[in-house]
Amino acid sequence: MIHLIKDILTSEPKGQAIDVYGWVRTKRETKNLVFIEINDGSCFASIQATFDRDTGLDNNTEALLKKAGTGVSVKVSGNLVPSPAAGQRVELQANNIHIFGDADQEKYPLQKKRHSMEFLRDIAHLRARTNTFGAVARIRSQMAYAIHTFFQERGFQYVHTPIITGSDCEGAGEMFHVTTFDIEETVKKALKEKKDPDSFKIDYSQDFFGKQANLTVSGQLEGETYATALSRIYTFGPTFRAENSNTSRHLAEFWMVEPEMSFFTIKENMELAEEFIVYLLKWALEKCKEDLEFFDSRIKKGLIEMLKNVVNTPFTRLTYTEAIAELEKHIDRFEFKPYWGCDLQSEHERFLTEEVYKGPVIVTNYPKEIKSFYMKLNEDGKTVRAMDVLVPGLGEIIGGSEREENLDILQGRIKELGLREEDYWWYLDLRRYGTVPHSGFGLGFERLLLYVTGMGNIRDVIPFPRAPKLAEF
């Protein structure tokens, strides 16, 4: 059986024979000893294998040890013993080494030094071998597991929503189109027929799906169809935005967690969102201790304390109108001046959480003009039952709402926003047949990971980032 290093490090050292598999992180030598640090990615820590020349290493082992530089993949055999060195419980008294794959030390990009994030993005296929990105990957895995565990424990059904869709959930139009048409041939044909460029339109009825199709921006609308049959569901999958934003906060491909709950009003929706965030941060603090300690010391000082503060502080609830009134008291503090009807900017969100309320905040009842068509209209006719969960150090981490269950009002909102009702016929059917109050929210998975890890760029918390002019690997 092949043992992971994380299990070996916590096992009882009794001199038992064991094989260690992994990649060499560092090697150092004295006259009689060779020390090799081996890591397999299963945990942050490496295990030290010590070769003692006084025991009589054969020529083959000596030759292999010379080749065992950083990045070389190995199997090292020996006996597991208590370590005399400070900071480690066990080490391997090694007697044999096998090299699976060499790594030319002159060419291997990951040298024994700190590399910049920009450099590591250029070699995203290798960056998971570093301490930083190995820790990001493990936390990403744990957070995904925690998300499924949270919802499964509460009776939610996991639903797979389509990647290719004919609808635009957000109504923003910033979507990647999916087509089997040959673009060059389509252009050549139009030029040959001397069609007026201003009047030329592609006939998608002849395309693969018989209509214009896109990559999904959200699984919410499809999720609602199952929530109105199974009561509580959640989706967790990739979404896509063709937004030409080249910033540290935007990706063209990212993962979304979207629960939808029948019979939930905005009140229950807020309660679930708060419970969800607290659950995830507690999970990270308990299950990812070693990796979080690394991020706290090397990436963002005070990270663990910030996460604990969110876990231990009740979420303040206030309306959008109350938030604007509070922000207007300090209007000179902001680059973007707040006013009723504006979308809250990151600087506003962080001011509310970090300086006014000193903890997480849930803002509700936003102006309808800045929110999506499916959000429930309030009695005032001006605001909708939207909610945003804001946390210190980041700003918005969750966005959601009570959904509009009234057919006439929903049709009016679709018309008001200039959307085509025929594109949403099936969504409107949910209001025609057994409509119910229902609510939901969305959590951007990478935004959660930015928060938990303290990393500064969203491109560094996803294995292979997709952004404008960036589609390598």
From Swiss-Prot:
It is found in: Cytoplasm. Its main location: cytoplasm. It catalyses: tRNA(Asn) + L-asparagine + ATP = L-asparaginyl-tRNA(Asn) + AMP + diphosphate + H(+). SUPFAM superfamilies: Class II aaRS and biotin synthetases, Nucleic acid-binding proteins. GO terms for molecular function: asparagine-tRNA ligase activity; ATP binding; nucleic acid binding. Homodimer. This is Asparagine--tRNA ligase. It comes from Treponema denticola (strain ATCC 35405 / DSM 14222 / CIP 103919 / JCM 8153 / KCTC 15104).
